[in-house]
């Protein structure tokens, strides 16, 4: 009975070649990172990323390898933090000083680029956290909707805060 169960359990996991092409995901090896507006190339240790989903291999069942990312340390973290603090510049940096309309334009551009990556993002969600395609698509679409709703809320807040009001004979802009 144990041998039978092991065989049945083993057989429910696909081989890599059994995975439909539209759901296959090439290894992603992220060697670049961004600090202070500069894309840098990491030459240090890497962290391997594996899916919670197992596949059948010649060595038995193994978690599907998804890729790797830089395993940075305190030095890089502090450098990134310093760059972020300098960029913010106590609210006088480029982004915080930018007009609401310009910030919205940048976020919209980001959303447009993100939408072009929808299928890849959906596959990543499927492999990284084991969601179904439908749930991964729903999560992606919900994220886009949330960003768009946030943009609309920021526009409304900006409109409301730009109004003139009159109180007790004093006219002022709020």
Name these PLM-found stretches.
Residues 2-127:
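Short, structured beta/alpha segment
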Residues 38, 173-174:
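Short Gly/Pro-enriched turn/cap motifs at secondary-structure boundaries
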Residues 1-2, 171:
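Short intrinsically disordered, low-complexity coil segments enriched in acidic
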Residues 74-85, 104-119, 133-160, 164-172:
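Long amphipathic alpha-helix in the N-terminal Rossmann-like dinucleotide-binding domain
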């Amino acid at each position: 009975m144990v041998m039978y169960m092991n065989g049945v359990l083993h057989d429910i996991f696909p081989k890599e070649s059994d995975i439909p092409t539209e759901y296959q995901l090439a290894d992603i090896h992220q060697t670049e990172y961004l600090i202070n507006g500069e894309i840098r190339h990491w030459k240090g240790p890497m962290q391997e990323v594996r899916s919670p989903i197992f596949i059948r291999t010649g060595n038995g069942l193994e978690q599907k390898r998804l890729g790797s990312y830089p395993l940075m340390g305190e030095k890089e973290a502090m450098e990134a933090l310093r760059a972020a603090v300098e960029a913010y510049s106590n609210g006088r940096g480029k982004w915080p000083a930018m007009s609401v309309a310009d910030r919205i334009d940048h976020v919209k551009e980001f959303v447009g680029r993100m939408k072009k990556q929808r299928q890849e993002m959906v596959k990543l969600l499927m492999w990284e956290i084991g969601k179904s395609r439908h749930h991964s698509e729903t999560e992606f679409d919900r994220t886009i909707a949330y960003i768009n709703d946030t943009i609309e809320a920021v526009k409304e807040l900006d409109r409301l805060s730009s109004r003139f009001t009159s109180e007790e004979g004093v006219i002022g802009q709020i």
